[in-house]
């Protein structure tokens, strides 16, 4: 009997170990944060501001009093109240009539749709400014190229001036070339004159022959 007792003991301890392992899971599931049962801070602020009858808006001190009267712990959630006011102002549900940031007076916005529409319109209007600034820079670069094109005709004018100078020099050469032609004509005239002299010489012998014939007749 003493040998069988140690064998039965481990079988009993195994279910206890499984139960101990399951308990931490339940504890971990119970450690999840619970959702707040009451309304959020922003909802409480909007209700308090809408309930106020002040024309200039509800101040921060009056808002805290209204929230404390509703059972909200203002001292612990002071930072949450300020953040809630800022978010409501940025969304357009509340309008800040006085002060800056969380301090000041706040009033319920009667036309929240208009403020959202204005905010959306302002954002697209700011975007076209960037391309408009780039266009003048591109336009300023283009005139530089045009100026470079204007400079190139000046270079073209210089060859034209050189051509006119060459054309002016060429008539001088033509006149020089023309002078030898006159000298070439003068020898022709000289050649034409020489035969006349030859004719005169030929005429003189004829006259001499005639004189000789006359003497013979006598």
From Swiss-Prot:
Entries under PROSITE patterns matching the protein: H15
**Signal peptide range:** none
The residue ranges of the H15 domain are: 37-110
* Annotated GO CC locations: nucleosome; nucleus
A Pfam family this chain is assigned to:
Linker_histone
InterPro entries xref list: H1/H5, Histone_H1/H5_H15, WH-like_DNA-bd_sf, WH_DNA-bd_sf
Recorded protein name is: Histone H1
Q: Sorted alphabetically, which keywords does the UniProt record give?
A: Acetylation, Chromosome, DNA-binding, Nucleus
Highest rank taxon of the organism: Eukaryota
- Principal place where this protein is found? nucleus
Q: Where in the cell is it found?
A: Nucleus; Chromosome
Similarity remark: Belongs to the histone H1/H5 family.
Q: Which positions carry N-acetylserine?
A: 2
Query: Which SUPFAM superfamilies did the record assign?
Result: Winged helix' DNA-binding domain
Which stretches does the entry tag as region Disordered?
1-42, 89-218
Q: Which GO terms describe its biological process?
A: chromosome condensation; negative regulation of DNA recombination; nucleosome assembly
- A single GO molecular function term of this UniProt record: nucleosomal DNA binding
Briefly state the protein's biological role.
Histones H1 are necessary for the condensation of nucleosome chains into higher-order structures.
Q: Where is the composition biased (Basic residues)?
A: 118-133, 141-158, 166-184, 191-218
Biased region (Low complexity) positions are 1-19
């Amino acid at each position: 009997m003493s040998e069988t007792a140690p064998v039965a003991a481990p079988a009993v301890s195994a279910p206890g170990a499984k139960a101990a392992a399951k308990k931490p899971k339940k504890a971990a599931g119970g450690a999840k944060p619970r959702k707040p049962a009451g309304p959020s801070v922003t909802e409480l602020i909007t209700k308090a501001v809408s309930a106020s009858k002040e024309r200039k808006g509800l101040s921060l001190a009056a808002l805290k009093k209204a929230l404390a009267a509703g059972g909200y712990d203002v001292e612990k959630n002071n930072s949450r109240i300020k953040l809630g006011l800022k978010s409501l102002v940025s969304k357009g549900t509340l309008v800040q009539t006085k002060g800056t940031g969380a301090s000041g007076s706040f009033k319920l916005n009667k036309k929240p749709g208009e403020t959202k529409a204005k905010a959306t319109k302002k954002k697209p209007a700011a975007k076209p400014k960037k391309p408009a600034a780039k266009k003048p820079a591109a336009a300023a670069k283009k005139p530089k190229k045009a100026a470079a094109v204007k400079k190139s005709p000046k270079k073209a004018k210089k060859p034209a001036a050189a051509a006119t100078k060459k054309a002016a020099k060429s008539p001088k050469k033509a006149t020089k070339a023309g002078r030898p032609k006159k000298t070439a004509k003068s020898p022709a005239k000289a050649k034409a004159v020489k035969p006349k002299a030859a004719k005169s010489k030929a005429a003189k012998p004829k006259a001499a022959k005639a004189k000789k014939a006359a003497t013979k007749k006598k």
